[in-house]
From Swiss-Prot:
Keywords: Membrane, Mitochondrion, Mitochondrion inner membrane, Repeat, Transmembrane, Transmembrane helix, Transport. This is Mitochondrial glycine transporter. It is a multi-pass membrane protein. It comes from Aspergillus clavatus (strain ATCC 1007 / CBS 513.65 / DSM 816 / NCTC 3887 / NRRL 1 / QM 1276 / 107). Its main location: mitochondrion. Belongs to the mitochondrial carrier (TC 2.A.29) family. SLC25A38 subfamily. It is found in: Mitochondrion inner membrane.
Length: 334
């Protein structure tokens, strides 16, 4: 009997994998859309915050608003600086959400106990208002901080142009003219004025925000769902949970980090006077008191709460719908 039987080796069928390029592109587009929406709608609040924080006498909101409304073109004045603000927030959000997703997906794939939320073994909660990975508190804190600082550095020149253009200290007639003047008088370094204070503000803010946001989402989702329910949340419930969680998380993180924002504004407006972050803090307290470190807090909380709630709700909704569509098309495995 012959032993020369032919042996056939059958290769396993290729596993379906996530289209990394398409998912990355969609996260970028979703972040861009969410950032543009919030920045355009809330530009007046951002402009008022800049005007209040630039004052040496802790100007209050109502007189500042009255001055703007009494100008020849009040509506145009309230939306002054919308273009740089939209560019900064839109592309900044796109970079931030794309980077944040990449970091979170990478950490989730490690499946280590320190990285994944204890409520789930695979990075996905049973009942959730989100399609994003569920990470531990420290992982949320770290990924939020790293992604925000990275995006902030890339968008820093636009941020400086935005602040200078919104301020009434400078008579810039165009963004191009503002950029040329900054480079001519301060060099390229002038386009990164206040980055230290910005990073010191953004790192803890973004880290705390993601931490608070994920915790609030988890708790609100558990309240909205019946105990041990396997049913997914309704779209309206998910959007409401994300919106409320985004607003509350932004309010908490903003209140904690507002002094950094006040210092950052002064550094970007008058870098020659304030020099660096520590000098700015000393001068602000000496000239205007501790209260100056909390200038514009009410406006910033209002704007941040609304912008974060809008941005994250729009972003999460787009991602949730995309994940569902891709799953139905067989492009990804959930």
């Amino acid at each position: 009997m012959s032993n020369n039987a032919t042996t056939y080796v059958v290769s396993p069928a290729p596993l379906k994998t996530t289209s990394t390029s398409s998912k990355t592109t969609f996260h970028f587009v979703a972040g861009l859309c969410s950032g543009l929406t919030s920045s355009i709608l809330l530009q007046p609040a951002d402009l008022l915050k800049t005007r209040v924080q630039q004052s040496h006498k802790s100007a209050s909101l109502l007189p500042t608003l009255k001055t703007i409304l009494s100008s020849p073109h009040p509506i145009r004045s309230l939306w002054r600086g919308t273009l740089p603000s939209a560019l900064r927030t839109g592309f900044g959000s796109a970079l931030y959400f794309t980077s944040l997703n990449a970091l979170r997906q990478g950490i989730a794939q490690t499946r280590t106990p320190l990285a994944i939320a204890s409520a789930s073994s695979d990075g996905k909660a049973r009942t959730s208002s989100s399609a994003l990975p569920k990470l531990s508190n420290w992982a949320n804190l770290a990924t939020g901080a790293i992604a925000r600082v990275a995006a902030g550095f890339v968008m820093m020149p636009v941020t400086v142009l935005k602040v200078r253009y919104e301020s009434d200290y400078y008579a810039y007639r165009s963004l191009v003219g503002a950029g040329r003047d900054i480079v001519r008088t301060e060099g390229v370094r002038g386009l990164f004025s206040g980055f230290g204070a910005t990073a010191a503000r953004d790192a803890p803010y973004a880290g705390l925000y993601v931490l608070f946001y994920e915790q609030l989402k988890r708790r609100l989702a558990s309240v909205a769902s019946s105990e041990y329910s396997e049913q997914p949340l309704k779209t309206s419930s998910s959007s409401s949970i994300n919106f409320v969680s985004g607003g509350l998380a932004a309010g908490l993180a903003t209140a904690i980090t507002n002094p950094f924002d006040a210092v950052k504004t002064r550094l970007q407006l008058m870098p020659g006077k304030y020099g660096n972050m520590m000098r700015a803090v000393r001068l602000m307290i000496h000239e205007d008191g501790v209260r100056s470190l909390f200038g514009g807090l009410g406006l910033r909380i209002t704007r941040k709460a609304l912008s974060s709630a809008l941005a994250w709700t729009v972003y999460e909704e787009l991602i949730l719908r995309a994940e569902g569509h891709w799953a139905e098309q067989g492009k990804i495995n959930l």
